[in-house]
């Protein structure tokens, strides 16, 4: 009971969840299973601290392998990647290989896909004698295509070696690497996941979602586990869950370091505060619900006109994100198109994955395109160099 209580936490926002309100769940997450007496391997150091603080005797299993950073560097050079592998990327790949599992925290534009590629090539090399496969999970169908094409850029024959899985696609193929949205495979039975001995989760902070945790728990015979994310939200429950599923977080680099080194452009945020008309303010005062407030904002003609003018006058590629498709995204796109000769591209959930990838590639080759996209399609992991 003492161990169970130590690894039991209240879930933030649980009181708003239907299962809690209905009395089916107490709003807590338990990382130690009292039925099986098992706990996530990634929590071994947390468990050791628990035992040490109470004077309990324990032995800690060392899962690291005998390999040097020079060995890893030689392996990466052998891959002949046509891009520079930076020092922090080498450090991250070495750390992951050394421990056979890792949770790498690295910001946007730090080259996470290159780190994933190097690690996948290492895993496939180790799998040649076993016939096992590698599973790469990403949160969106667009990232499935983007990761596939990134591998091609790195000089890999992705067509022969990678199987892309999205909703409605075949879940099996005679290829060593599967790239899938986690939504496409989470309902598969445990037997399906037995074919993998390496799993990668991009945007791993989403692993706090129950369906993705379920996938990880089905991978019972999977020694290689790697999660990559640009952020951890600071909540103890999420940090421990991610640590358990993968390993103790390793900070690879920071956005500031990337800016200081010139790897990415300096970031400047301009926050624009709009002063609404007296008539609009009167309307706003009688709004009672959050949904009414959202409707007021997205349907406000003056506000939409300001957004459209701003988008058409900015220099360089411009991204306009929206939440509501029919009420906001569609009319906003039409208004912007009517005000400019620039290329205006629209992306929403119904846009096919190959079309989204074509738009992303077009934007990479352009310097004056406007993309109007739903928040769900362009909010996570999209990389336009």
Predicted feature locations:
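Interdomain "pre-motor" coupling segment immediately N-terminal to P-loop NTPase/helicase cores
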Residues: 12-67
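Conserved pre-motif I regulatory segment
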Residues: 31, 50-53, 59-105
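Conserved helicase ATPase core of P-loop NTP-dependent helicases/translocases
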Residues: 145, 161-173, 319, 330-331, ...
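Post-DEXD/H (motif II) to motif III coupling segment of the RecA-like Helicase ATP-binding lobe
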Residues: 205-270
């Amino acid at each position: 009971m003492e161990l169970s209580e130590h690894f039991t936490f209240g879930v933030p926002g649980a009181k708003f969840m239907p299962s809690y309100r209905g009395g089916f769940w107490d709003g807590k997450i338990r990382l130690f299973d009292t039925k099986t007496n098992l706990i996530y391997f990634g929590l071994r150091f947390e468990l050791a601290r628990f035992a040490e603080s109470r004077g309990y005797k324990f032995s800690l299993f060392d899962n690291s392998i005998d390999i040097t950073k020079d060995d890893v560097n030689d392996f990466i050079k052998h891959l002949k990647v046509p891009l520079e592998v930076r020092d922090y990327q080498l450090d991250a790949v070495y750390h992951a290989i050394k421990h056979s599992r890792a949770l790498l925290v690295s910001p946007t534009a730090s080259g996470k896909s290159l780190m994933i590629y190097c690690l996948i090539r290492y895993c496939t090399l180790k799998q040649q004698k076993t016939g096992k496969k590698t599973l790469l999970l990403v949160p969106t169908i667009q990232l499935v295509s983007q990761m596939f094409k990134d591998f091609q850029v790195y000089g890999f024959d992705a067509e022969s070696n990678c199987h892309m899985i999205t909703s409605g696609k075949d879940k099996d193929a005679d290829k060593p690497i599967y790239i899938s949205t986690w939504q496409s495979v989470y309902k598969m039975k445990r037997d399906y996941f037995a074919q993998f001995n390496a799993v990668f989760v991009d945007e791993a902070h989403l692993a706090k979602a129950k369906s993705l945790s379920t996938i990880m728990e089905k991978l019972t015979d999977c020694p290689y586990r790697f999660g990559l994310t640009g952020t951890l939200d600071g909540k103890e429950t999420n940090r421990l869950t991610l640590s358990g599923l993968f390993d103790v977080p390793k900070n690879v680099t920071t956005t500031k370091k990337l800016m200081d080194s010139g790897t990415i452009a300096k970031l400047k945020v301009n926050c624009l505060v709009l002063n609404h008309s007296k008539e609009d303010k009167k309307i706003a005062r009688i709004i009672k619900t959050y949904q009414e407030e959202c409707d007021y904002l997205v349907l406000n003609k003056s506000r939409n006109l300001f957004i459209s003018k701003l988008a058409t006058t900015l220099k360089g590629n411009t991204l306009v994100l929206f939440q509501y498709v029919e009420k906001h995204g569609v009319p906003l796109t039409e208004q912007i198109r009517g005000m400019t000769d620039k290329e205006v591209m629209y992306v929403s959930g119904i846009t096919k994955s190959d079309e989204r990838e074509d738009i992303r590639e077009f934007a990479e080759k352009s310097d004056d395109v406007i993309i109007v996209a739903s928040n769900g399609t362009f909010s996570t992991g999209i990389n336009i160099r």
